[in-house]
A protein has these predicted regions:
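Short S/T/G/P-rich N-terminal loop/turn motif that feeds into the first structured element of a domain
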Residues: 1-57, 61-66, 75-79, 102-124
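An amphipathic, aromatic/His-enriched active-site/gating alpha helix that lines ligand/cofactor pockets
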Residues: 71-106
Length: 124
């Protein structure tokens, strides 16, 4: 059952993917044309990026790159790993997940305070 309440997904994770081969890279990239033959809006992509275990909020992928990365919101590293596997992305690329305690962006509201509570372990 798809969890629609994503408010509890508070932690930020970056996933770095490395395509298993050039063929797998091409297959992955062309799969979106099959999934969205008439194109897709950012809104529809965002709606589809809410998974059972984690939510993918951003992805960066170059046409000629052998790797790509995504930004996820989730409760745990394990939840992100389960989400990547449930979408089948691991059939195209190896991946590793890194929790990032600090997420700053020019896309966030300009007056939003950046949470530095866990930034670089304040006790260092």
């Amino acid at each position: 059952m798809l969890e629609t309440n994503t408010e509890n997904r508070k932690k930020n994770y970056i996933v770095i993917y490395d395509f298993l081969s050039e063929k797998k890279s091409d297959e992955y990239k062309s799969s979106f044309n099959k999934l969205y033959p008439k194109g897709v809006t950012h809104g529809k992509w965002a709606e589809d990026a809410v998974g059972e275990f984690a939510t993918c909020s951003q992805t960066w992928l170059g046409n000629n790159s052998t790797f790509f990365c995504s930004h996820y919101l989730a409760n745990s590293k394990e939840d992100v790993e389960k989400q990547v596997q449930s979408w089948g992305t691991d059939k195209y690329a190896s991946f590793f997940v890194v929790e990032v305690e600090r997420f700053t962006s020019s896309l966030k509201p300009k007056d939003e305070i950046i949470n530095l509570d866990n930034w670089y372990e304040n006790n260092k």
